[in-house]
Amino acid sequence: MRPYEIMVILDPTLDECTVGPSLETFLNVVRKDGGAIDKVDIWGRRRLAYEISKHAEGIYVVIDLKAAPATVSELDRQLSLNESVLRTKVMRTDKH
């Protein structure tokens, strides 16, 4: 298991109250494969540096988790298939 941080930018037309429950369906992929979700931090609606899919704003979510590399790539794949996800960024958070 490796520690990861995933930043997800969601469509700003979504209701911010539904962001957490909708992400839970994706995070179940990590739990099924024996990973652990450490923290889900919903930053809320923020202005983007440049437009993505004709949106000037997005709802930012940062997820800290521990999982196998294959599990994280599957989670990233499933997130990218969702139309309400504008962008994802996966980073390993190992301390050297």
Curated annotation (Swiss-Prot):
This is Small ribosomal subunit protein bS6. The gene is rpsF. Keywords: Ribonucleoprotein, Ribosomal protein, RNA-binding, rRNA-binding. GO terms for biological process: translation. The keyword Ribosomal protein applies. The lineage of its organism: Bacteria, Bacillati, Actinomycetota, Actinomycetes, Mycobacteriales. It holds the Pfam family Ribosomal_S6. HAMAP family: Ribosomal_bS6 (MF_00360). It comes from Mycobacterium leprae (strain TN). Binds together with bS18 to 16S ribosomal RNA. Belongs to the bacterial ribosomal protein bS6 family. One of its GO terms (cellular component) is ribonucleoprotein complex. CDD domains: bS6 (cd00473). GO terms for molecular function: small ribosomal subunit rRNA binding; structural constituent of ribosome.
